[in-house]
Every structure is written in C-alpha cells, then in structure tokens.
C-alpha cells in the first residue's frame, strides 16, 4: 500500500508543478498582450493615403448583365479596399494609430465582401459566355491574395476547360 501512496503523492506533486508553470507562462503571455494593447491605444493617427489600396479594373469589364449581383459588385468596386487579413487590430493600431482602426476595418470588410461576391459574379459571367472576363477577374483576385476556395475552383475549372479545348 505504501508504494502506491508514494507514487500517487509524487504524481500529484509533478502535476502541481506543471500546472503552476503553465499558469505562470499563461500570465506572462497575457501581460505581454495587454502591454502591447496599452501601447497601441496611445499611438496617434498616421497617414493611410499611401497604403496599397485595391482597385478593381472596371474598365476591363465590358459586360452589362443587369443582375443584382453585378450591381452589388460594381457598387462594391467603387469603395476603397485593403487586404488586411492576418493583421490583428492591435497591430493595425500600432502601425496606423487608434483613430484609423475603424476606417481600416471598413476597408478590410469591403475586401472581404469583394472576395465573397466575386465567385457569384464570375459564375454569372461564365453563364453569359464571358469566360475571359470572368478569368481576368478571378486572376485579379488571386493576384491581390484573395484566399477563397470558390475563386480557386472557378479559376481551375476555367483553366481545365481551356486546356481541354486546345
């Protein structure tokens, strides 16, 4: 009976050690996060006019399908867009100032809406026989790092279709 009790006590001590070590590490991570957040809230507004804004090449889209998707696409294309995927709000505040966070988030949301809407619009273009216009838009989206499986699949199907025709 004594060896089992000794093993159990040693197990509890080791477990307690690892739990405390994990708590200390977690507390350190939290303290670093809140310190970074505190610093980011003190950053003044910086110029964002020179950022790499995404501009959809509307002049290369000659088609007028007169659909609600197309109307939404063209309305969205007029709005400023930035691909800020993977950048935290804290990092945005540190880099561009707290006052710019709301507008940068809006520009990022415009880009996210563009990525979500593009596959539907490209599908409508393909169905209307405008495969080259659809391909150009899909390639443009890939070029601005629009990470979407739907875009990739549509572009792949267009590539497969064109290679099978040749």
Question: How would you label these PLM feature ranges?
Answer:
Residues 2-113:
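N-terminal alpha-helical interaction modules that lie
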Residues 93-97, 159-166:
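Alpha-helical linker/edge segments of TPR/alpha-solenoid repeat scaffolds
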Residues 117-118, 152:
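TPR repeat positional signature
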Residues 124-125, 158-159:
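Residue at a conserved register position within TPR or TPR-like alpha-solenoid repeats
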Residues 141-142:
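Alpha-helical solenoid scaffolds that mediate protein-protein interactions
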